Design a protein with these regions (language model features):
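Catalytic metal-binding/acid-base residues of hydrolase active sites
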Residues: 39, 75, 165-167, 200-201, ...
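Sec-dependent N-terminal signal peptides
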Residues: 4-13
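Positively charged n-region of N-terminal signal peptides that target proteins for export
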Residues: 1-4, 18
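Structured beta-strand-rich core segments of catalytic domains in phosphoester-bond hydrolases
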Residues: 68-158, 268
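N-terminal, active-site-proximal structural segment of metallo-dependent hydrolase catalytic domains
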Residues: 15-85, 98-104, 179, 289
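Metal-dependent phosphoester-hydrolase catalytic domains
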Residues: 172, 176, 183-194, 202-289
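Active-site neighborhood of phospho(di)ester-bond hydrolases with catalytic His/Asp-centered motifs
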Residues: 70-72, 94, 195-199, 223-226
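Active-site-proximal beta-strand elements of phosphoester/diester hydrolases
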Residues: 30-42, 119-123, 157-166
């Protein structure tokens, strides 16, 4: 029996070595990040109403295996609907009108089996960012940003994630909102790898996005699309449930990165089921490491 055990030792050692290598590979798994304006629950949307879309929205998030999701325009009932359908995700955020449940959330979601939230919070895009429900500059609406420091359970490494939705009317609100976001990313995220998701209501050549990505600014971010090794899908993300002609559609939904994150893949997921859309925006997905 002792001889048999000694003969098996090399094979056991090899098997354990392979297991160790496999574990090392697993800890190097990319992180899939999605930004998704899900369109607020508007009864006037007819067949595009949330009641007809909520199952498909949840399935899309799960199908694309998103580890982190930044959502915009989520009303409280929509938050509850998604929480019920995506129990493997934790959500962070509050309603922008009162800091509780009123108004749209810019909710952050993360997979509970992949990440732990070490810290999180939110602030308003206004001159008084800590005042709940405050409206900034010339903005038409209250605007909020939600952030978290997430620790990867596979590696122990941390990253800073922020999700927001800039104003659709106020020029100054977008400009000053971006300044505030960049300052907060630096203040809260420091030297951590940074991911910023959101609907910026601005096209890539706009002053707003140039402000975000200006390399002369030490706080600048990088548009993930511009550095991805593989880019997939159209160059637009807003289509208004398909009503905008292709040549007039625009890319206003972004994922930005900073501090050494490598963007492996970037995709705009312009899918439909027949004539049915997930939202009036497309989800955007990146894979980073």
């Amino acid at each position: 029996m002792k001889k048999i055990y000694l003969m098996l030792l090399p094979f056991l050692a090899a098997a354990c070595g392979q297991g160790g290598q496999q574990a090392a590979v697993q800890t190097d798994e990319p992180v899939n990040v999605m930004t998704f304006n899900v369109r607020y629950d508007n009864p006037e949307d007819s067949l595009n109403n949330w009641n007809y879309r909520k199952e498909r929205v949840a399935k899309a998030i799960r199908f694309y295996d998103a580890d982190i999701v930044g959502t915009q325009e989520v009303l409280h009932n929509q938050l509850v609907d998604l929480q019920q359908r995506l129990p493997e995700y934790e959500s962070i955020g509050v309603g922008r009108e009162d800091g509780k449940e009123a108004g749209e959330y810019s909710a952050l979601w993360y997979r509970k089996d992949r990440f732990t939230a070490k810290d999180n919070g939110w602030f308003w895009l206004s001159e008084t960012p800590e005042v709940a429900g405050s409206k900034g500059w010339d903005g038409a609406c209250e605007r909020i940003a939600t952030w978290a420091i997430l620790q990867d359970k596979l590696t122990g490494k941390e990253c800073f994630v922020l999700n927001t939705h800039l104003d659709h009317v106020g020029v100054a609100a977008r400009r000053e909102g971006v300044k505030l976001v960049l300052d907060k990313v630096q203040e809260l995220g420091g030297d951590l790898p940074v991911i910023v998701t959101g609907d910026f209501n601005a096209e890539p050549e706009s002053d707003v996005i140039k402000q975000v990505t200006d390399p002369a600014d030490p706080e600048h971010l990088t548009d993930a699309r511009t550095v991805a090794k593989l880019v997939y899908g159209p160059d637009w993300s807003f289509h208004d449930f398909g009503s905008i002609p292709y040549e007039h559609r625009s890319r206003i939904d972004y994922i930005f990165v900073k501090n050494g994150l490598e963007v492996l893949k970037y995709g705009i997921l312009a899918e439909t089921e027949g004539d049915a859309y997930l939202s009036d925006h497309t989800p955007v997905l990146v894979s980073v490491k």
